[in-house]
Each structure stands twice: as C-alpha cells, then as structure tokens.
Amino acid sequence: MFDFGLGELVFVGIIALIVLGPERLPEAARTAGRLIGRLQRFVGSVKQEFDTQIELEELRKAKQEFEAAAAQVRDSLKETGTDMEGNLHDISDGLKPWEKLPEQRTPADFGVDENGNPLPDAANTLSDGISDVMPSERSYASAETLGDSGQTGSTAEPAETDQDRAWREYLTASAAAPVVQTVEVSYIDTAVETPVPHTTSLRKQAISRKRDFRPKHRAKPKLRVRKS
C-alpha cells in the first residue's frame, strides 16, 4: 500500500529501537500493527463502497436508457394511434350524413303492418295481377274462337249439355266467397270442491288410540312382613 522497501523498514525499526528502547518497542510494534490493520480495513471498505457506487451508477444509467427507450416506443405508438384516429375522422367527415346511417327497413317493406297483419295494398296488388292475367287469357281464347269460326265459316252454337251445366255451377260455387261461421265457446267451471277434514273426529281418534296403549292393570306392590 505504502511504497516502502526492506531498507526503509529496517531504518525505521532502528530509529524506533533507539528512541523507545527495547522495553517499549514490542508494545509500540503491536500498536503500530493494529493501526496499520485498521487503516487497511478502512481503505478496503472505502474501496468496496466506491465499487458499489460505480455498480449502482452503471445500473442507474442502464435503467435510464431502458426508460428512455420505453418512452420513445410509447410516444411512437401514441402518434400512430393519433394518426389513425385522424384518418378515420377524415373519412367519416367526407361521408354525407345520410350515408353514415345503415339502411332502414320498415314492416311495410315485408308487406305487413306494425302488428304483423298483411297490408291491404299487398292483397289488392295480388288481385290486380290476377285480373291482369285473366283478360289476356280471355282475349286469347276469343281470338282463337274467332279464328276457328273464320276458317270453318259461320256455324250454329251447340246446345249446353247437362255435364257443361254442372261444371259451370261447380265453378261458380267455388268462386263465391266462403262463409265464415262463428263458433261460440263457453267455459264451464269444473273445479272440484275438496272436502274439509273433520278435525274433531281425528282428535278423538288420536285420544282413543292413546288410551288403548295405556296399561289396563297396574301392578300392586307386595308388603313383606318381617318376622321377629
């Protein structure tokens, strides 16, 4: 620790021997050794403290670098999210107000009202379609009849037979509107009246059962007569 050689130590020992004498020299040497040991321990503790501080400083620097990198990543993610939100807002602002809403459907689009009943317009449309088809068929049939009459010439219409008359009546009856018959339904109360249990009779039966279980004959104690 101290840059002393062997010659310097011998010189110091001779001076101490002359100054202190042979009696006090061993005690002085022990005291000097203790002081040197304390000094070495103090220097070692200071050196260890310096090493610990250096390690803590390195760890502190590494921690600061890690926190700086994490903050940089966080800022970059925040900027990316802000840019995406701005793009979405720009897209939504570019749309018209009615284009932002989804397509609205009403019960009328399905041919029913709010209660689920069919609308009269749908029924009329169906009947109009049937009526539109029927005249075309009639005109086609009349044109075909006229064509046949033009080819064969004017002929007398045949008389209506019984079979044709029955078929016509059947078609007329089926075309008529069906008659809806209303049926009256009456409800009859069929609840069965349950009888109320007779509590008095049940109580009497329980008392009679208890009496039956009682012993009928009681044992009489026998007295012993002591003979003198």
Swiss-Prot record:
One Gene Ontology CC term in the entry: TAT protein transport complex
GO molecular function: protein transmembrane transporter activity
Record-level GO BP terms: protein transport by the Tat complex
Function summary: Part of the twin-arginine translocation (Tat) system that transports large folded proteins containing a characteristic twin-arginine motif in their signal peptide across membranes. Together with TatC, TatB is part of a receptor directly interacting with Tat signal peptides. TatB may form an oligomeric binding site that transiently accommodates folded Tat precursor proteins before their translocation.
Protein name: Sec-independent protein translocase protein TatB
Oligomer and partners: The Tat system comprises two distinct complexes: a TatABC complex, containing multiple copies of TatA, TatB and TatC subunits, and a separate TatA complex, containing only TatA subunits. Substrates initially bind to the TatABC complex, which probably triggers association of the separate TatA complex to form the active translocon.
Transmembrane regions: 1-21
Annotated Basic residues bias: 206-228
HAMAP family, per database record: TatB (MF_00237)
Pfam families (UniProt xref): TatA_B_E
Domain of life, source organism: Bacteria
Family according to the record: Belongs to the TatB family.
UniProt subcellular location: Cell inner membrane
Keywords carried by this UniProt record: Cell inner membrane, Cell membrane, Membrane, Protein transport, Translocation, Transmembrane, Transmembrane helix, Transport
Membrane association type: Single-pass membrane protein
Residue segments, region Disordered: 109-162, 197-228
Stored InterPro entries: TatA/B/E, TatB
